[in-house]
């Protein structure tokens, strides 16, 4: 009904039941509180604000901040029409970023980075945007306040932005800047632990982007990942554990530490109140490793042990789809 994609997603409605905005999970708690307060005080929904910008109208500062912190990745047609392609989305984000007043440095930089990241992931990006996006990226990397405001881009988008915006001979230096930013996030005790754990995953993807296709991280890099994952697993509390394990096993898998990823998931089965989630993850892991029979078995066990009517339908469909794909005979 509400087109929710990913948990947790907070959707703020007006008294008339119109969606004002949706706020992504994952940001640091202080910024989350400020964005939530901004949304609760908002009068106009994000969809209306976008239309106003498209019509050349002036927005209040609070409106721009609401646009900058909207969960665009979880929009699902609530603001942007589902029929528009990624190129059209990029042009929309570019319009928003360009129209945002320069005095609103944080909001403008966030909209610029959203546009640049969307552009970098296009199959055939319009190179007319390259110079401005590279300038914006350099500005963010050079400014600690802008980097902190664009935490998601620092963690997740370093590889794609570096590859799209720079010539191969220039990429190493910018990757090193991203590397230093990510390491600072991991070591920053003022940030929430889930954010710091996701930064480990971002570090892995950044290092892999410098390698030839199908190449693995070095032994020393894998050892570093193992140590950081062990630290993260030991640091989480019971309320954080399920989400943390979901992040950490995928980090191990991305780093080529498949046995460690499997062991983490198997251990999670013994402590989780919803082990079927991790059974499904084990199915995915074995599928990726080419162990089809084991994968189907885990998908089946996930379905058999799942609780709740909607969950059982979801896991049941997942089992059937994978059984047909992996064991067609």
Mark where each language-model region is.
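Non-catalytic, surface beta->alpha helical segment in thiol-disulfide oxidoreductase systems
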Residues: 4-46
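Solenoid-like repeat scaffolds
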Residues: 54-58, 96-102, 137-147, 182-194, ...
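Generic helix N-cap/helix-start motif at coil->alpha-helix transitions
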Residues: 59-64, 105-115, 144-160, 189-208, ...
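Residue at a conserved register position within TPR or TPR-like alpha-solenoid repeats
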Residues: 162, 207, 252, 286, ...
């Amino acid at each position: 009904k509400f087109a929710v994609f990913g948990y947790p997603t907070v959707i703020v409605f007006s008294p008339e039941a119109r969606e004002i905005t949706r706020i992504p999970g994952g940001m640091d708690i202080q910024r989350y509180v400020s964005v939530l307060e901004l949304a609760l005080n908002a009068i106009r929904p994000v969809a209306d604000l976008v239309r106003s910008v498209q019509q050349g109208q002036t927005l209040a500062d609070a409106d721009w901040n609401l646009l900058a912190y909207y969960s665009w990745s979880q929009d699902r047609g609530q603001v942007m029409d589902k029929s528009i392609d990624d190129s059209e989305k990029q042009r929309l984000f570019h319009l928003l970023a360009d129209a945002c007043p320069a005095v609103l440095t944080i909001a403008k930089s966030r909209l610029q980075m959203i546009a640049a990241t969307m552009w970098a992931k296009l199959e055939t990006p319009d190179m007319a945007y390259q110079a401005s996006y590279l300038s914006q990226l350099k500005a963010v990397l050079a400014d600690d306040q802008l980097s902190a405001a664009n935490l998601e881009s620092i963690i997740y988008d370093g590889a794609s932005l570096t590859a799209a915006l720079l010539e191969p001979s220039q990429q190493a230096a910018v990757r090193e800047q991203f590397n230093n930013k990510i390491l600072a996030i991991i070591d920053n005790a003022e940030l929430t632990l889930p954010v710091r754990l996701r930064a480990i995953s971002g570090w892995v993807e950044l290092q892999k982007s410098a390698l030839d296709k199908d190449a693995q991280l070095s032994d020393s890099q894998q050892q570093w990942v193992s140590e950081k994952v062990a630290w993260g697993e030991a640091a989480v509390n019971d309320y954080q554990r399920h989400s943390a394990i979901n992040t950490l096993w995928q980090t191990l898998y991305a780093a080529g530490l498949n046995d460690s990823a499997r062991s983490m998931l198997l251990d999670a089965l013994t402590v989780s109140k919803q082990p079927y989630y991790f059974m499904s993850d084990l199915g995915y892991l074995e599928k990726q490793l080419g162990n089809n029979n084991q994968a189907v078995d885990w998908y089946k066990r996930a379905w058999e042990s799942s609780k709740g009517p909607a969950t059982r339908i979801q896991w049941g469909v997942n089992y059937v789809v994978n059984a047909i794909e992996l064991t067609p005979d």
